[in-house]
């Protein structure tokens, strides 16, 4: 009987240890770099949710017949990261940027780049087709896709020392959550609209 209880304890301890090691070791499903992106688990911070601590406290006490075994587990939290965005309290600033890139009908527009290293912040949209973006950066639409070298985007020539007046939300710069299929739809529409516009 004593050998059976030792075997049961050893089997139970190993299975729980494997479960916890697998849960903590494969924590990539607990982290994210933008939950809508297919590659959101790449190069993310290793995070463990707080429910694991309470689970560890529950798992540490095993009782077998009259044998009470208590395991000690140390939980160490390195750093907690939290992001809270309140849309009602964003600061609006006036824009007077004297060195920004625009797409304009006077320039050679949409030179296709075939290289892999394309940054999403190389060009602004400032055309009638995209007036709702208010000269917004390309990285508002494609920062994750372009910076991970997954697509090719046209690049317009730059106009330097062009002043622009308007309002912008500085807190949203570089944050725009859209799925990849919408990116492709937007760029197909933009490309067709720009091509028709240039042919006039």
Curated annotation (Swiss-Prot):
Keywords: Membrane, Transmembrane, Transmembrane helix. It is found in: Membrane. It is a single-pass membrane protein. The chain crosses the membrane at residues 7-29. GO terms for cellular component: membrane. Overlaps HYP2. This is Putative uncharacterized protein YEL034C-A. It comes from Saccharomyces cerevisiae (strain ATCC 204508 / S288c) (Baker's yeast).
